[in-house]
């Protein structure tokens, strides 16, 4: 008995639910039939043709999909919000089972032809036509989602630390302001960010909205439109890591060209390699940015600055290498170069010149003395005058040579005969001899002295050649060091001056706070 009661109660509930659903469906069907009896969706919903249809329009920004800098197009996902009144779509809820809203396809009713004026892909209408919501008061709400590609003028002045202002301009395509009057949705003069998804490339800074009314005259009707400004700032981490830092490091590699020794053949090779890498970065930037001639991007300024500095460094390096390999046979060093680069600049640059390369016999021989046995046949120096007097008439076979001529350029011999008739040796090495006494030398000895003089002259010339070469090398070293300091200072100043010129480079954007502000308004 109890189970049969429960079954009867359940069946009763199901019947009541089914009846209510059928009743509600019948009420909605009857309402739609009554509302659209004689309704013409092609005519503006006004009772008098002089009246305006007031349309409240708003925009909800859902996602910033992409900003194509080269084509100057912003792709965004938005929700449109349109509200207007249609006096033909009013009813009394009590007459139709308390129905408070109707959801119908948009093709059933009249709707304003609001389009995006600055559309960039040719599709001016929304693709997905969602249902319209009709309320008993005649208010019609339409919230279609749309993906727009709008034209956006890109200002590349401070790229990649740039801030862009993209606009989305909406208005009626065929109706003027005297027929369809636009107003801001719920008087919100901003874009709604309640459902916004944060972008990984851009931060939203501000999203104001403005209603523009262009007053007409007798010849031109009034026009209205609503313009939404999407002010965005680029997140710079990607470009800083992939573009800015490599460019800065490459620019300072130009300085290291002057740290290589001039004898190294890799100085010019390094400079040309850096030049080629800069060309690659210039081509990369040209593919990213629009081909505009109005302004020069910040990164292009820096690349151009680095390119010029590297070109100048290659030219200076060629000059340094040329000076490094100069010698006395091809060039003579002017006095002003010797004074500036060998005396003043090294002291100014805190450079200490290496010791000059001198021949060992010029460095270590303070004086020169006759050997104990100048010639094996002459015996001791005391016996030399006796030997000379003994040979007497054979002087024609001997050549006379002053002892003052038997000297080395840095070790001059001073010989004289003492009162005892012996040939004495002076203590010092001087060019001028204190005595003009002479001795007789055999032809073999004369040839030997000539050979010694030839060797001494050759050594003197070789030493002069080496010293001149070393002077030119040191001049090249001084220029290298000077250019190292100059290029480091100029490169540092140029890097700071160009990159720090961006106005928002150090500003932090709290995206969550901005979204919360425009969500709570």
From Swiss-Prot:
Disulfide bonds join 152-166. This is Acetylcholine receptor subunit beta-like 1. CDD domains: LGIC_ECD_nAChR_proto_beta-like, LGIC_TM_nAChR. Residues 25-235 are extracellular. After binding acetylcholine, the AChR responds by an extensive change in conformation that affects all subunits and leads to opening of an ion-conducting channel across the plasma membrane. The lineage of its organism: Eukaryota, Metazoa, Ecdysozoa, Arthropoda, Hexapoda. CNS in embryos. Keywords: Cell membrane, Disulfide bond, Glycoprotein, Ion channel, Ion transport, Ligand-gated ion channel, Membrane, Postsynaptic cell membrane, Receptor, Signal, Synapse, Transmembrane, Transmembrane helix, Transport.
